[in-house]
Design a protein with these regions (language model features):
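Gly/Ser-centered flexible loop/linker motifs
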Residues: 28-31
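Short amphipathic alpha-helix segments
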Residues: 10-26
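A generic structural motif
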Residues: 41-45
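Short Gly/Ser/Thr- and Asp/Glu-enriched loop/turn motifs at secondary-structure junctions
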Residues: 36-40
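Conserved short beta-strand edge segments in small beta-sheet-based binding/regulatory domains
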Residues: 33-34, 63-70
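Helix N-cap motif at beta-to-alpha junctions
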Residues: 47-52
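Short amphipathic alpha-helices in soluble, non-transmembrane regions
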Residues: 19-23, 55-63
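Short glycine-/aliphatic-rich beta-strand segments at the starts of folded cytosolic domains
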Residues: 1-11
Length: 70
């Protein structure tokens, strides 16, 4: 499994749950969660393969910033 970590500006738990649902619809075999306690509002995705550009696109299309943490 690969793990990719993203920095976001998602601050509301309810919205993070909606975004997780959208991401799970696109990536059904992935484990996806937000760490809302972290200052970078971390989005963590674990899967066999990950398409960071698609994840970023989904968050951006919902009005949120998202970038891969390096």
């Amino acid at each position: 499994m690969i793990v990719e970590v993203f920095k976001t500006n998602v601050v509301e738990v309810e919205l993070s749950e909606l975004l997780i649902q959208q991401l799970e619809d696109q990536f059904p075999d992935s484990l996806i969660n937000f760490d809302m306690e972290d200052c970078d509002k971390i989005l963590r995705v674990e899967a066999a393969t990950i398409a960071p550009e698609k994840i970023i696109q989904i968050l951006n299309s919902n009005g949120y910033s998202c970038e891969v943490l390096t």
